[in-house]
Amino acid sequence: MADQIPSWSSFRLYYFRHFKGDPQKEIAREGLTAYQRNNRPLYGSAMQYRESVGCYQVDETQGDIYLVSKWDRSKVIGRPNVYLAIDTASGLIAGVYVGLDAGETALMACIANAAGDKAAYCAAYGIDLSPADWPSRGLPSEIISDRGGEFMGDRINELCICYGIDRQALPPFRAEEKPLVERAMDLIQDSYKSMLRGRGVIGDDVGERWATDYRQQAILTLDEYTAIVIHTIIALNKGRVLTDIGHLPVDAPNTPAQLWKWLTDQGKSTLLDVDADELYRRAPGDSADRST
């Protein structure tokens, strides 16, 4: 057995190669961005980044489904854009925009939704909402996003200056810095894909040769799809069990909606209370040039 025991130098080499690599060597070999994304030390979960509600992670994706016009269901209108705002401390999906617009207009609509009355928003789509299931209301005090054009544009900059909102723009290719909103996007789309197969949902073979033309399967309108997204958000807010809240007391709730209420009841909130009409008046809008 003694001849099978590695020498100290061999053990040390194995340990540093497989368990404790030299950061400088890894950076030289893979680059700083790859090291920060995949190999840097982690000292906690994303939800430990903030102790109070009011810091929102914001992102956008294109829905994996084709939609039709509500005026003429034989006409395909394309794929919707989905914007989400997720509270960092509670994991609650605080705001959403679903539509064909993209860019700053859609982003402002998502932030306005996060600040507004969710019961009225849901009622517009025929959904009866209990306020406890989607309790978020108010502007965030901090916004975390990537460096997309809509997140770095003049309109969001004016809004942040107007209300004193802090803004953090992440470096390129660093989606892991806002994991809550990235995961929420996947959860929402994965929740309905299996139920809507054959109804315009895009499969994994999209773009491949001889792949199905999913546009021909589209049957849902934008309003119908939006209602599905809203139902999914409500279910995630009130029923999803959070697993990364070990930093909180044992009596803390483990679902986003209940954790939001628990934090706000303790005064741990940095939300900015604004009136919906005031926000509409003060929110920056698009500009247009008059032409002949």
Question: Model-derived features: where do they sit?
Answer:
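C-terminal, beta-rich DNA-binding module of retroviral/retroelements integrases
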Residues: 45-47, 52, 62, 230-292
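Short, flexible loop/turn elements at secondary-structure junctions
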Residues: 15, 59-62, 86-90, 98-102, ...
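Active-site beta-loop-alpha junctions of metal-dependent nucleic acid enzymes
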Residues: 97-133
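Acidic/histidine-rich, metal-coordinating catalytic segments
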Residues: 123-151
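A conserved mid-domain beta-alpha-beta active-site/ligand-binding segment of alpha/beta enzyme cores
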Residues: 212, 216-237, 241
